[in-house]
Amino acid sequence: MFIAPFVPSPQTVVEYMLKLADLKAGEVLFDMGSGDGRTLIMAAKTFGARGVGIELREDLAKKAMGNIHENGLDDRVTIMNDDMFNVNLTSADVVYLYLTTSANEKIKPNLERDLKKGTRVVSHDYEIIGWRPDKVENFCENPQIGYPSHTIYLYKKP
């Protein structure tokens, strides 16, 4: 089910979000709606994590797989061309979201069902209604001009 357009997170925002989520080497990051794979590539290259990307659009899934291959990360990052509602998230240590508030609302039951205690969920600009964030931080992508500004929500599964 299509629930959000492809709008890539800027690299500086991705790095900030992964640091906020305290992503560690060897952990597994799930990117729900992984687009071109940029978040997964940074997670693997910069943080030493493993990644699983879920992308409904076949063209974007193929692009992500190509980008992952070009970066030599085929052994650490996987792309699933599938609907995020069909995916088991039990192996996730961190879940990355850049959806919409309504899309977060729709994926919330899957997160509540599958995530183990302590799993971190980091969301770009859109909160998860009914969940209490551990942190809410504003990140200015270009401080010299004062915008664009991004709100980052960090949640931990109790």
Where on the chain are the PLM-derived regions?
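C-terminal substrate-binding/active-site "lid" region of AdoMet-derived donor-dependent transferases
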Residues: 102-158
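Conserved SAM-binding loop of SAM-dependent methyltransferases across substrates and taxa
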Residues: 38-47
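Conserved SAM-binding motif I beta-strand of class I
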Residues: 50-55
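A short SAM/SAH-binding and catalytic strip from SAM-dependent methyltransferases
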Residues: 90-106
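S-adenosyl-L-methionine
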Residues: 1-27, 61-91
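Conserved class I S-adenosyl-L-methionine
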Residues: 26-35
